Amino acid sequence: MRTVGVEEELLLVDPATGEPRALSAAVLARAFLDDSEQDVFEKELHEQMLEFATHPQADMERLHAEIVRCREEAGRHAGGIGCAVAALATSPLPVTPSIGVNRRYEWMAEQYGVVVHEQLVLGCHVHVSVDSDEEGVAVIDRVRPWLPVLAALSANSPFWQGRDSSYSSYRSRVWQRWPSAGPTELFGSAERYHRRVADMLATGTVLDDGMVYFDVRLSQRYPTVEFRVADVCLDASTAVVLAALARALVDTAAREWRAGAEPAEHSVSLLRLAAWRAARSGLTSELLHPATMRRMPAESVVRDLLEHAGEALAAAGDLERVREGVEKLLRHGNGARVQRELLARTGSLREVVAACVRRTQAA
């Protein structure tokens, strides 16, 4: 069975005011003092964020337990220096981000200017194991039209600089400012994929292959394909639903490839429109259907995703968990809806952050 690993980026906030705190270096130092052998947590581009990565897991129950544990540990380390962690993909409250200190980040700031300074956005990346680069590229070609559906399920960033953005995932719109970000055309082979990356690097526009920010890509460090479209999810259980769906999409795509089925030839222009619509309305309105690229109710598109990936979900033993998780999202809403409902109820973005801090730590 394919293994799955999850990387989550968490926002460091003041527990009293809800404002982001530039304390990632101090939190990492605290984590090292508590456990000198820990290698779970890493710094990121901005000092108001902290990243962790799980181990590869084949069992979704174990993956869920590890995500919960990592969130709890992050909260404990942050609490030791007077801040808290929140699984929020953007800060609801206004913030002036602080860029971390290292040569890579300095190069990025000089090269991209305000794009870097405004990139305090937090995502969830899912790694799914593949047998080879050839299989991985075949998967990338075949999962492309389904990625906006995953983005809609995860959407958790309605607020930007203290106001409602009108988007469910404004994080994804900010992320698209990077020159290498977004959907890709069909590659057709691993050789063409690697040639395309080499051509991009040869322009000098991106620093290295780590900055090739395709929506789904071959990992530079692991034998995996890496899904990069999701907001960090408010609930750990939603992150596991995304991970299980990503694995099922990989299994389904690999099976289609081995059977000789050709991938859908949707243009990058249409895929960008599908991604925009998912970011704009999440699960509240319509999405572009992956088969037709025409508008359909979001609930219908999500149910078609379950049907498309259902055989693989059942084979992995994940079907019931994913069905229940998806029904919960359709019934009660994704993180974006939860945040808006919190604001409507409390009238305070500070209270929104406080509630999300508590929810981040919940099992």
UniProtKB/Swiss-Prot annotation:
It is an enzyme of class 6 (ligase). Coiled coil: none annotated. The keyword ATP-binding applies. Keywords: ATP-binding, Ligase, Nucleotide-binding. Its EC number is 6.3.2.2. Disulfide bonds: none annotated. GO terms for molecular function: ATP binding; glutamate-cysteine ligase activity; ligase activity, forming carbon-nitrogen bonds. It holds the Pfam family GCS2. GO terms for biological process: modified amino acid biosynthetic process. InterPro entries: GCL_type2/YbdK_subfam, GCS2, Gln_synth/guanido_kin_cat_dom, YbdK. It comes from the Bacteria. It catalyses: L-cysteine + L-glutamate + ATP = gamma-L-glutamyl-L-cysteine + ADP + phosphate + H(+). ATP-dependent carboxylate-amine ligase which exhibits weak glutamate--cysteine ligase activity. Belongs to the glutamate--cysteine ligase type 2 family. YbdK subfamily. This is Putative glutamate--cysteine ligase 2. It comes from Streptomyces coelicolor (strain ATCC BAA-471 / A3(2) / M145).
